[in-house]
Amino acid sequence: MRDRCMLSFTKEQLTSVGEYCTLHSSPLPKSVEEQCRVTDERSQDEVVMAPSPAQCAWLMSFALASRPRRILELGTFTGVSTLAFYEGTRKTKAEIITVDMSEEYLQIAETAFRRHGATDRIQTIRGPCLEILPTITGEFDLIYIDAAEEEYEAYTRFVLDHKLLSAEGVMLVDDGTYIRWFYFFQANWWSVLLEGLVVDRSIVKEFPEEIQEPYLGIADQMNDFNRYARSDPRVEVTMIPLFNGVTQITWK
């Protein structure tokens, strides 16, 4: 229907729908499937930081279709999305640089990269993304942002100001950083849409009382980023109600 931009499911239905989509998509490569399982063994409040198997399949297909030569990922976590990009660029042999400030998570990711023979094209860098970005040179055809949400605008401004995004490149801005209250919700919804809180502040009443005010602040931050991205005259911006909400940015 034209007036519906996304399907509506209850939180209880989301897991089943995700599993159905994965079942009816091409099988995930062994490396991605195995790292999804490794990630699922983490505590529930950590697991929600990782892309779902269905999202990994989409990231792979996006990389396969766009054929990037170089990929920059801000936010590695356990390396699930990194491996999805690796598998999606086997034909093009894309160079992948992934950045994360957590030594613990990078060790988990690097172990997986070695186990699956992916170190030939993946370079990991540890440190805060805003400190690492100035040290990165060259252009990237695909930039994937999945790190600290309060820094989304700063990441995007730096990428554009320093032309890290190639002329025909695509920047995908996905969900943000970990908040300990995630485990209250079955779906991974921390995103540029913030489960609708960016457009309907009354939704906050569904949250535990002690986090309502902080989450309204988070919604304000996400709205600030969304408005900034839309108003930057240098780029074309499309916000897609896909998974947790994905903003796609390209040069005009």
Swiss-Prot record:
UniProt KW Thylakoid keyword: no
Uses: Hancockiamide D displays potent cytotoxic activity against murine myeloma NS-1 cells, suggesting a potential antitumour application. More interestingly, hancockiamide C, the likely end metabolite of the hkm pathway, shows potent Arabidopsis thaliana seed anti-germination activity, but is inactive against the monocot Eragrostis tef seed, suggesting that it could be a herbicidal lead targeting monocots. The herbicidal activity of hancockiamide C could be due to its phenylpropanoid-like structural features, which may act on the plant lignan pathways, and hence warrants further investigations.
GO terms of molecular function: metal ion binding; O-methyltransferase activity; S-adenosylmethionine-dependent methyltransferase activity
Metabolic or biological pathway, per its Swiss-Prot or TrEMBL entry: Secondary metabolite biosynthesis
Enzyme class: transferase
Binding site for S-adenosyl-L-methionine: 73, 75-76, 81, 100
Keywords from the UniProt entry: Metal-binding, Methyltransferase, S-adenosyl-L-methionine, Transferase
EC number assigned by the record: 2.1.1.-
A Pfam family: Methyltransf_3
UniProt record, GO biological process: methylation
Family indicated by similarity: Belongs to the class I-like SAM-binding methyltransferase superfamily. Cation-dependent O-methyltransferase family.
Function: O-methyltransferase; part of the gene cluster that mediates the biosynthesis of hancockiamides, an unusual new family of N-cinnamoylated piperazines. The NRPS hkm10 and the NmrA-like reductase hkm9 are proposed to convert two molecules of L-Phe to the intermediary piperazine called xenocockiamide A. Xenocockiamide A is then converted to hancockiamide D via a series of hydroxylations and O-methylations.
This protein's name: O-methyltransferase hkm8
Organism name: Aspergillus hancockii
